[in-house]
């Protein structure tokens, strides 16, 4: 009877709390306290029993480069096995062994978290219940029990001697650093610069590596202090010119993810703790993105994007709620007039979020018609740049895929350009670089057939074929739209107050619904094949940066979103007449904003300018120097911002040339005038240099049906000049300056393979850059350059922190690079 009574009880849940997890139903069957106490008598802690019997402990301990896997304790029988991040996965195999009763509950001996294999989720516990009492008992036994000297074998003695030698070396290095710090005290830092280790919560090395670099970003810590200030008042200029007084709004406290981030950065600056456990911050990230739950191997760049997007979304929500309170209406039901007013004020936000102020930059895509030489610009923001990494094998194959139908004169003129073009376009398209020639030819034929069908359909229905060549950017950075993709492939835009101004690269498009962890279907339109494919995000493992080739939805100029027909074409006939490459326009600049009152604001701004064609594609410095060295980060930036030719199926629909052919502008009646497609020139350059530049090297690629990692070493400098990749009118750059310098302060390195790898971080402990802080906080642009701040590099692998020379950092296999602006 007692069991029935306890079985029927339910745990009271507070609706206001977000931290409570669902109660595991397998605790009673997976927990055996009597067997556990017997098994923990005279046991060696934190050692996998199966690896020890296989004589693999000694071999793994001798390798300094390989990290020791986490050990999990079975709460049913006391078996100790290595976790999922190890090669053997003995703890998982122990659970999968058929038995009469399940051995599904395991306890991590590193961070004392409980995991249920049946639920495939973490089990929450407290000290009052049975599970919490068992965990407390195991922790006491682990702290009390110590191995006796007589029981130690020769192998363990050798291991302890090696550990003592390492500890003595570390102490000597620390003494040297302390002496150097005494001789050269920091000038601008009132507090001591510290680098601490981070506890691995279970395959969270991808998270720890990114957090180490963010903790060495002083500007982020300063802005978070400003955001946390209570009673912050923000003034927003009125959207209507008739209203002269700005709207004053009182901001609420920041969201839980932002508060957890601020708490984590403050904890990293404390000098008392040697190792920090970022459990609260990681749990908040998992609430924004459910894919990070489960302690699986994940991707660092994906984690960084979700983290920044989550904090930015919370900041936009603060502003939206403040605007509603300023109008005296905080209810969810609003009339249409008030809704429009709120959205107008949201668009007029004078101060961007702290994420955009630190990591935000701007890209400008320029397209020029070869006949009328009219220039059109597309501006969009970004948080990081995903750069292509070309493998030697893919580069050789792509060179052989040149079009053999070209004349000899064209080959002589464009041979070098076509080699780069083919290799780069192939890397961006959905045709894998490692596929056979037969599949590649078949894909090209299919693309040509679809292009012909689209041309025929366009003549019949008066549709336009290549708006994507004008209105979207073919590079791996695309504006992030808060879009909800339905299973039928239709694009439904959520009416939300959150302004998504970030950029997601085309291979991996994340929207706000991803942050809520809801699986969905995404319909993608690739650039080369113009075909549609549906990708089930729920069934795809995104570990280790497996990229999904998707593109963000495209809007036309009237605010209507472009939907796909049954034949895969894009219906953009309505509203295209508003976008014209009209060289006869008198104003120098016309902004064509793709905003609609009923939708969330986007970040792309289209404009047609009367700009000199000779200087439109010029950069602040010479860029041709970096076209030779293919193994450098400068060459990756060169490929990312390279000049492209829009020809053949990618021709530009030029309204100026169309009007000239029709002898002047006339009313566009269907079937009366013929559209003119011309060759065009296209290039993407940086038009706003971010204070903190984040570069992502796309090392993980798909070759046929297999996944591979490009282990090629990419050289990256300690001082990077971004001027060869910036426009002449680059913002945040003084008029006479021809250099845009950045200093390296953080690296995320991935070692291993696609299936089993490890992330580590290189971070530079240094003094804060005062000029950079003034730029971010106050917008001051100094005329002269500040010297690079000196500091000490550290290599951090979870809890292990070691000082390293600069040469070791520059020789690492970088996956993410963090640069700060030198001003």
UniProtKB/Swiss-Prot annotation:
<dbReference type="GO" id="GO:0043024">
    <property type="term" value="F:ribosomal small subunit binding"/>
</dbReference>
<dbReference type="InterPro" id="IPR050164">
    <property type="entry name" value="Peptidase_C19"/>
</dbReference>
<dbReference type="GO" id="GO:0140950">
    <property type="term" value="F:histone H2A deubiquitinase activity"/>
</dbReference>
<comment type="similarity">
    <text>Belongs to the peptidase C19 family. USP16 subfamily.</text>
</comment>
<feature type="compositionally biased region" description="Acidic residues">
    <location>
        <begin position="409"/>
        <end position="420"/>
    </location>
</feature>
<feature type="compositionally biased region" description="Basic and acidic residues">
    <location>
        <begin position="394"/>
        <end position="408"/>
    </location>
</feature>
<keyword id="KW-0963">Cytoplasm</keyword>
<feature type="modified residue" description="Phosphoserine">
    <location>
        <position position="531"/>
    </location>
</feature>
<dbReference type="GO" id="GO:0051301">
    <property type="term" value="P:cell division"/>
</dbReference>
<feature type="binding site">
    <location>
        <position position="51"/>
    </location>
    <ligand>
        <name>Zn(2+) 2</name>
    </ligand>
</feature>
<feature type="active site" description="Proton acceptor">
    <location>
        <position position="758"/>
    </location>
</feature>
<feature type="cross-link" description="Glycyl lysine isopeptide (Lys-Gly) (interchain with G-Cter in SUMO2)">
    <location>
        <position position="140"/>
    </location>
</feature>
<feature type="modified residue" description="Phosphoserine">
    <location>
        <position position="552"/>
    </location>
</feature>
<dbReference type="GO" id="GO:0051289">
    <property type="term" value="P:protein homotetramerization"/>
</dbReference>
<dbReference type="GO" id="GO:0035520">
    <property type="term" value="P:monoubiquitinated protein deubiquitination"/>
</dbReference>
<feature type="domain" description="USP">
    <location>
        <begin position="196"/>
        <end position="822"/>
    </location>
</feature>
<feature type="compositionally biased region" description="Basic and acidic residues">
    <location>
        <begin position="421"/>
        <end position="430"/>
    </location>
</feature>
<keyword id="KW-1017">Isopeptide bond</keyword>
<dbReference type="GO" id="GO:0051726">
    <property type="term" value="P:regulation of cell cycle"/>
</dbReference>
<dbReference type="GO" id="GO:0042393">
    <property type="term" value="F:histone binding"/>
</dbReference>
<feature type="binding site">
    <location>
        <position position="94"/>
    </location>
    <ligand>
        <name>Zn(2+) 3</name>
    </ligand>
</feature>
<dbReference type="GO" id="GO:0140014">
    <property type="term" value="P:mitotic nuclear division"/>
</dbReference>
<keyword id="KW-0862">Zinc</keyword>
<dbReference type="GO" id="GO:0005634">
    <property type="term" value="C:nucleus"/>
</dbReference>
<keyword id="KW-0863">Zinc-finger</keyword>
<dbReference type="GO" id="GO:0043130">
    <property type="term" value="F:ubiquitin binding"/>
</dbReference>
<dbReference type="GO" id="GO:0008270">
    <property type="term" value="F:zinc ion binding"/>
</dbReference>
<keyword id="KW-0131">Cell cycle</keyword>
<feature type="region of interest" description="Disordered">
    <location>
        <begin position="146"/>
        <end position="189"/>
    </location>
</feature>
<feature type="binding site">
    <location>
        <position position="24"/>
    </location>
    <ligand>
        <name>Zn(2+) 1</name>
    </ligand>
</feature>
<keyword id="KW-0597">Phosphoprotein</keyword>
<dbReference type="GO" id="GO:0004197">
    <property type="term" value="F:cysteine-type endopeptidase activity"/>
</dbReference>
<keyword id="KW-0010">Activator</keyword>
<dbReference type="GO" id="GO:0006508">
    <property type="term" value="P:proteolysis"/>
</dbReference>
<keyword id="KW-0539">Nucleus</keyword>
<keyword id="KW-0479">Metal-binding</keyword>
<feature type="binding site">
    <location>
        <position position="48"/>
    </location>
    <ligand>
        <name>Zn(2+) 2</name>
    </ligand>
</feature>
<dbReference type="GO" id="GO:0006357">
    <property type="term" value="P:regulation of transcription by RNA polymerase II"/>
</dbReference>
<dbReference type="GO" id="GO:0006974">
    <property type="term" value="P:DNA damage response"/>
</dbReference>
<feature type="modified residue" description="Phosphoserine">
    <location>
        <position position="415"/>
    </location>
</feature>
<dbReference type="GO" id="GO:0003713">
    <property type="term" value="F:transcription coactivator activity"/>
</dbReference>
<dbReference type="InterPro" id="IPR001394">
    <property type="entry name" value="Peptidase_C19_UCH"/>
</dbReference>
